[in-house]
Design a protein with these regions (language model features):
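Charged, low-complexity intrinsically disordered terminal segments
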Residues: 1-119, 129-141, 146-223
């Protein structure tokens, strides 16, 4: 009991280097930035914005998610991605290995998307009998980047609990939509793209697809 009473009285002070990193000047500027932000709180709007972004893509799409399912909203996203791929848009899909194995390998829409030449699927830490001790190493990222111009980032997974109005069993969450007006020079956009590339290049990410049209690579679980 005494520990609980007196422990809050001790507060370790950050060292000078760390305190310098937390200065307000590191996060603010006197000049206007070139990125515009919109908060998205509604689940139906969250799905619509994802579909709008994917539909508007001309060059590239990056979609990273923890839990993508082949339910109503997930199928909407997969159909939109397939349509974008048909137009020649380069697509990179980064998904966590557990939910990919549970919910996607039997999806025809996912199989069709993964088989396209201009689509790469990266699976983070695929389920593997030899990697049982790394089973809890999961990726919870959730964002979409389109044409190096805009991104949507937040806490929503890619399924009916978080997107659309297909079910009454919903989760309350929020996304931030960021549009860059500086031709790809927006700082937060660049940081997110650099972060994605860092994760994409991790050894635990198994990448399938791209210019390889071997149908055996469509199933992206780890052998």
């Amino acid at each position: 009991m005494l520990v609980n009473v007196f422990a809050p009285l001790y507060c370790r002070k950050p060292d000078e280097k760390f305190a310098e990193m937390l200065k307000q000047t590191e996060f603010t500027s006197d000049t206007p930035g070139g990125e515009r932000i919109r908060c998205i709180d509604d689940n139906e709007e969250a799905l619509l914005w994802r579909l709008r972004m994917i539909g508007a893509a001309k060059k590239s799409i990056v979609l990273a998610t923890f839990d993508l399912r082949a339910d109503e909203s997930g199928t909407d996203l997969l159909a939109a991605l397939n349509h974008a791929a048909e137009k020649g848009v380069e697509i990179k899909l980064l998904i966590d290995g557990i939910y990919q194995q549970l919910f996607l390998n039997g999806s025809k829409e996912f199989q069709a998307l993964a088989a396209r030449e201009n689509v790469e699927v990266g699976v983070y830490n695929p389920v593997s009998p030899v990697g049982i001790f790394k089973l809890n190493y999961r990726m919870h990222d959730k964002y979409v980047i389109v044409d190096d111009k805009m991104y949507l980032l937040g806490g929503r997974n890619s399924n009916d609990i978080f997107l659309g109005d297909y079910t009454t069993d919903v989760n309350v969450d929020r996304d931030i939509l960021v549009c860059d007006t500086t031709n790809g020079k927006g700082e937060s956009l660049q940081e997110l793209e650099a972060y994605f590339q860092q994760i994409w290049n991790e050894d635990c990410v198994k990448i399938k697809g791209g210019r390889k049209k071997n149908s055996s690579e469509i199933s992206v679980s780890e052998e």
